[in-house]
Amino acid sequence: MKYVRYIAAESLRMYPEPPLLIRRALESDELPPGSGGPDGVRPKITRGVDLFLAIYNLHRSKDFWENPDTFDPDRFDRPFENKGVQDWAGFRPELLEGQMYPNEVASDFAYLPFGGGQRKCVGDQFALMESVVTLSMLIRRFDFELTVKPEEVGFYTGATIHTRNGLPMRVKKRVFPGKSETEGGEASKSEPVKAAGSAVAA
């Protein structure tokens, strides 16, 4: 199940929900070292200003991720550091000991699909566990085949990321030898579900 958990985590890295977070400064402050432009000036934040945090861009940044546009669930088992980013501690898998999923602590706030700190989503662990259990049950019982080219799916963003035209798939029920459809066993072949070929929107 560890690999399935990492698949869910990597999916949220590449397509975070939401792709943008908004925070309001309670007090005037300035951003930490390394956050300024080429001149090194640290931007000042005025009390009451709304800050838009581009999580999608953060998760796709080469500063914080190795090959960021590649789907690679195993990346969460590998340390990654970038001395060019001032005061960033890097991604440290050892900090995930006892944790089921990657988090902002192990990534020093480079991984924020649910936010981080005191304002982090309180349901993050439940949401991840629910998605992993659901995914595991589905892929055990069905085979899924995308009926369009991946580049044809398309995305658009609002409060969350959506597929532009749904996610058309051909779904086939997996058949287990010597077992009824409701019993377990090892899969031997696939048979089309009655609704095979219909579009399944994600």
Where are these regions (language model features)?
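Conserved cytochrome P450 K-helix E-x-x-R motif and the immediately C-terminal K′/meander segment
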Residues: 1-39, 62
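Cytochrome P450 heme-binding "Cys pocket" and the immediately downstream C-terminal segment
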Residues: 106-107, 116-120, 124-162
